[in-house]
């Protein structure tokens, strides 16, 4: 991110100080938006992840704040709950991202997603990503729910259509 900012500022030198000011304002706004969105979703957990990268890969932390949360998660068009459910789907499908999956299951609960929605999204991935990925996802959800003291009733009759939640 520092290199990108330096390149933008270098390009703006020919255009004058107003361009450089605008570029910095945009960068600062994106970072503020990213930090706010990350905090809304993860509480302090997201900041801890970013801070843990400062000694080895600070740029990765900046990308998480500025791009993932400052650009993508803060876009209009989808609620934070919907964004978290889609992220849970993707991380479940990957099958090898349990730490990140747990963070996003926690985040989904923080922004108002229902535990039953989270379970259904993970179950849906059994069809597309395979049963091992779905089993790993359910294990991650079980851990997050247990940590929060959440108990959900399993649906036992698949013939009963699911309730619409949105």
What is each stretch, according to the model?
Residues 1-7:
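Bacterial N-terminal signal peptides that target proteins for export
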Residues 19-81, 110, 136-166:
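Acidic, glycine/proline-rich low-complexity segments that act as flexible tails and inter-domain linkers
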Residues 79, 96-119, 132-146:
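Extended intrinsically disordered, low-complexity coil regions enriched in Ser, Thr, Gly, Ala
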Residues 83-91, 101, 121-122:
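Short, structured motif recognition centered on aromatic/hydrophobic residues
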Residues 88-94, 130-131:
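Active-site-proximal catalytic alpha-helix in oxidoreductases
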Residues 123-129:
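Acidic, glycine-rich active-site loops and adjacent beta-strand->loop/helix elements
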């Amino acid at each position: 991110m520092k290199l990108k900012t330096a390149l933008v500022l270098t390009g703006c030198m020919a255009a004058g100080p107003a361009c450089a000011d605008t570029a910095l304002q945009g960068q600062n706004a994106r970072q503020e938006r990213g930090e706010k969105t990350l905090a809304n979703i993860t509480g302090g957990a997201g900041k801890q992840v970013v801070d843990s990268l400062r000694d080895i890969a600070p740029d990765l932390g900046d990308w998480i704040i500025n791009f993932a949360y400052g650009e993508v998660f803060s876009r209009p068009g989808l609620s934070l709950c919907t964004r978290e459910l889609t992220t849970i789907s993707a991380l479940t499908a990957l099958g090898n991202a349990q730490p990140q999956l747990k963070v996003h299951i926690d985040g989904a609960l923080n922004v108002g997603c229902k535990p039953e929605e989270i379970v259904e999204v993970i179950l849906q991935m059994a069809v597309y990503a395979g049963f091992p990925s779905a089993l790993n996802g359910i294990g991650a959800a079980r851990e997050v729910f247990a940590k929060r003291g959440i108990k959900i009733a399993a649906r036992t009759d698949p013939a009963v259509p699911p309730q619409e939640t949105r």
